[in-house]
Amino acid sequence: MKAALGDVAPEVAFWRPSPERHNLAEVAFHHTFCARSVRGQLSGTTPEPFVLEGQDWFALPGPERLAWPQIHAAVEEEQTKLAALVAELAAGRTLSRLSEAERFNLVLGITCHAVYHAGQIQLLKRLHGA
């Protein structure tokens, strides 16, 4: 995800291949919400409030609601928090009420989710001509 988002300009982030399709900003922000959810499940806590009110998919037609640098920063921050938690769990410094298999499935699931959406982002960049 980090590599896919590294070279994205704001005009590319909010471009849509067609009116009914998600833009790159929405795809990235959706993944951020999902990663936050997984972090909460792994830790057994309620994560801090999300950047925007709502759930899962957020309409981001342009930078009016949230600018691309803020979205990109939110993605980076959530990925960092999730990676740190997974490392803490693996080292035994943080406990989870979930079984090892449940933790594995959540981490594998969100990793596959990131790869899937990173591929979508790469495709959107290619379609845009970026």
Where are these regions (language model features)?
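Amphipathic alpha-helical packing segments from all-alpha helical-bundle domains
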Residues: 1-4, 78
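Short, contiguous alpha-helical
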Residues: 2, 10-56, 96-130
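Short coil/turn linker and secondary-structure boundary residues
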Residues: 8, 22, 63-66
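Extracellular-facing binding/remodeling surfaces
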Residues: 9-11, 88-89
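Acidic/histidine-rich alpha-helical segments that form the ligand environment
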Residues: 58-95, 105-110, 114
